């Protein structure tokens, strides 16, 4: 999730119904391009698996996971309970928990799968690495798996920056802005390295490129990616109003980008990239 401790509800981006719809759409996009929800080779036919979803938001990932597993125990955590669902799958519980804080002692070594998606960007790289290591410690030694999905704001190749110049401008502006919030603009490029440095076994990675708008051969998926990104640009404009003085970045800097990027998406396209990395705890 997108965390900023001094915001009213704990999130940098807005937390209204529109943002909830965007997060659901983003979940569906990533799942489509992953090919399936869980890439870690769990024993799916084994009953009573224990699964954690860190940064669960409204629990949609857990809801999908509940249809794949046999009588699992599902645990969702987030920095804010605002989006926790009133209607929950059986054997599902939700807890308020920041990735920067110690986890409950009794959770250590207890999960068959620890999952997290698009969360680690909300802290600086060194803190992000330690946050992932604390999550790994929650997996069962020898048999427990972790699966992390992250993106980066510097994923365009030099050729793609020429092809999608407005998207490149947006990424450069946000990459300059995020360190002022103590965010990491490139976590997707670091996760595999961190997991291998920890000593995880059977580490694998899947890189997903999602064409935006006119660049997507599937019009429905292209439109979903376009709407998702337009709302992201708008949300970062709002976030820029919270920047301290002297950063050299203004919310108004996003206005021409928001105007031009819509045209670029509808005429040329764009690219989103996400990295999913999974491995087994030794």
Swiss-Prot record:
Q: Which GO terms describe its molecular function?
A: methyltransferase activity
Which pathway does the protein contribute to? Mycotoxin biosynthesis
Highest classification ranks of the organism? Eukaryota, Fungi, Dikarya, Ascomycota, Pezizomycotina
Q: Which residues form a coiled coil?
A: none
Q: Domain of life, per the record? A: Eukaryota
Presence of the UniProt keyword Transferase in the record: yes
Stated EC number for the protein is 2.1.1.-
EC top class named in words: transferase
Q: Name one GO biological process term.
A: methylation
Its protein name is N-methyltransferase gliN
Function description: N-methyltransferase; part of the gene cluster that mediates the biosynthesis of gliotoxin, a member of the epipolythiodioxopiperazine (ETP) class of toxins characterized by a disulfide bridged cyclic dipeptide. The first step in gliotoxin biosynthesis is the condensation of serine and phenylalanine to form the cyclo-L-phenylalanyl-L-serine diketopiperazine (DKP) by the NRPS gliP. GliP is also able to produce the DKP cyclo-L-tryptophanyl-L-serine, suggesting that the substrate specificity of the first adenylation (A) domain in gliP is sufficiently relaxed to accommodate both L-Phe and L-Trp.
- Identify the keywords attached in UniProt to this record, alphabetized: Methyltransferase, S-adenosyl-L-methionine, Transferase, Virulence
Family, as annotated:
Belongs to the methyltransferase superfamily. LaeA methyltransferase family.
- The gene from which this protein is expressed is gliN
